[in-house]
Amino acid sequence: LAQLSGRTLGHLTRGRYTQVTLDTELNPTVRQDGAREIPVEALSHGARDAFYFALRAALAQELAAREPLPLLLDDPTAHFDEERRGSLVGHLEDLAKDLQVILLTHDRRILNQVREAHVLKIGTESSASDSTRKIQIRR
């Protein structure tokens, strides 16, 4: 789990953090090659989000070998720059080959980066008399 998440984290952080360590109580730390361990809480928001994505993706891949379960992600790119967002989309597309990926996001830029998606758009239309929910599905 640590090795697989470390590879993904290294890719998402452009090689800045390449190793993940989990102690006996599963407390995570990250490190650069040959550098000291850094608690995840000390990372920037973007690096922390990248770490948690890498860990969830690694766990989903390990579990998929036994029983594929959907991977549900809620706005994983909130603190990502465009390059890191593109890297994450690439990982999601790789994961989607073996398991169902459900991504909840308000970031419309992701739609321009994915090759294939089923989009469920939920919004609100208001009129003077009532408020109704509208749902659009796009392939």
Language-model features: where?
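Terminal ABC-like ATPase head and other globular end-domains that cap long coiled-coil arms
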Residues: L1-R139
